[in-house]
Amino acid sequence: MKKTVKNLTALLTLALAAPWALADAASELQTRLRKVSVFSADFTQNVSSANGKQVQQGSGKIQIKRPNLFRMDNKKPQESQIIADGKTLWFYDPFVEQVTANWVSDAVNNTPFVLLTSNEQSHWNQYNVQQNADTFVLKPKAKNSNIKQFDIRIDGNGVLKGFSTIEKDGQSNLYMLRNINNNDIADNLFRFSVPKGAEFDDQRKKKK
């Protein structure tokens, strides 16, 4: 009987502690991210299938300016741009000449990259966060998210080392960073204008 009571007490303690642990991890991650206000780096991307087989390699450049400004230029194997200007998340595919625009608040569920620059608690509230040393594991609360998991590797000084995603179908994307610097970045690099002749899918009008 005493053993049963002890087991129940231990389980209750873990149950009560879990929410606090998640909250502490989210707070620690946000604290680390806030330590660096400007960041840019080249990246290499490895895409693997659910069974671990590498299916594609890519490269590009990522630029961050806090708060809320984000830009990712994919250069290989195919050019594309993801730009967050603080309100709108733009995705541009020059190969098919198509632009998609979403409100950041609507897109963060499927595009967790914007959390790297976001101070908006409503964005962070969409994810559960766990910490394992310098790796933070983010899992979306919404069941309809296309993302299963987003990992951020960042040290105690706020230096972003890399990140990765696991999609709902099991495909993983690993981003490794190099040529990291903290030189100032002009705000106009985070502005986007729809190129002439491009097809424009404005999801903002459909959701607001």
Swiss-Prot record:
One GO term describing the cellular component: outer membrane-bounded periplasmic space
Main location: periplasm
Keywords: Chaperone, Periplasm, Protein transport, Signal, Transport
Domain of life assignment: Bacteria
Cellular localization per UniProt: Periplasm
Pfam hit, one: LolA
Signal peptide span: 1-23
Alphabetical GO biological process terms: lipoprotein localization to outer membrane; lipoprotein transport
Transmembrane regions: none
HAMAP family: LolA
Oligomer status and interactors: Monomer.
Family per similarity comment: Belongs to the LolA family.
NCBIfam families to which the protein is assigned, alphabetical: lolA
Function: Participates in the translocation of lipoproteins from the inner membrane to the outer membrane. Only forms a complex with a lipoprotein if the residue after the N-terminal Cys is not an aspartate (The Asp acts as a targeting signal to indicate that the lipoprotein should stay in the inner membrane).
Protein name: Outer-membrane lipoprotein carrier protein
Organism annotation: Actinobacillus succinogenes (strain ATCC 55618 / DSM 22257 / CCUG 43843 / 130Z)
